[in-house]
């Protein structure tokens, strides 16, 4: 599943639905979603008998955020272990894989080491089956200090103020975990 494009949730169901509808209609968020979905499809197509992706993204609602999601299914031509497949898909466009060369600019522009941010998190069993996702929200704990990480997809129509607000929404999910 490709996840990209986000907005906040609301306790008011009508407002929550409105926010979700705005997200579904957002050209900027749909572009972000399409970039991620196309990359996944392209990687899978090279190794699959067939690949099927939904024509339109759907909403996935979590506790404090909702995302655009494109379900993607594929029948691989030959068995591929979960870690090998993750290696083929990583890094995703969400963390700088596109446009080409963007990932190499990030350390210079950010001026910090991302550590394990954006790595694969999940499980893999002895048969190499598994389920993994990209760690786009994570925390590094060192003694009494917690460094929280979250990010956004930046595309042509991105607004820095809106992207900062989206990052803050994503970080809010981590605060209760590290505050205890």
Kindly give the residue locations of the regions a language model identified.
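Conserved hydrophobic core element of enzyme catalytic domains
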Residues: 71-180
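Contiguous alpha-helical scaffold segments within structured protein domains
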Residues: 1-107, 176-179
